[in-house]
Amino acid sequence: MEKLGTINISYHAIATIAFQSALESYGVVGLANENFARGLSRFFSKEPTSGVIVHEDESGISVDLYVIIEYGTRISSVAESVSHSVKFNIESMTGIPVKAVNVHVRGLRVSDMD
């Protein structure tokens, strides 16, 4: 196959895939800004890269996710599911190897019992 040029995938695009994959995972109710001290006004952000940091080196990419999990779910199971989902979706959509997905649980959301 003749090579016609290069393909560049931005960190923003990769972060958006990671963000959406995490939000679609059972038990995740939102992503928090990585710098939690920025205040509660950005606690549940809908910005498609908030709470996601992408790092790249010669061996692939790593992703840090800062998630809010639903109270009552098994935190370790939710985090593991998020990790697998994010890795699978990034690799299948971009073809870029993901060497690590680090899930940081920033808080729990307690649902109203009404």
Regions found by a protein language model. Name each.
Residues 1-71, 80, 96-108, 112-114:
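Contiguous, often N-terminal, cationic amphipathic patches that form binding interfaces
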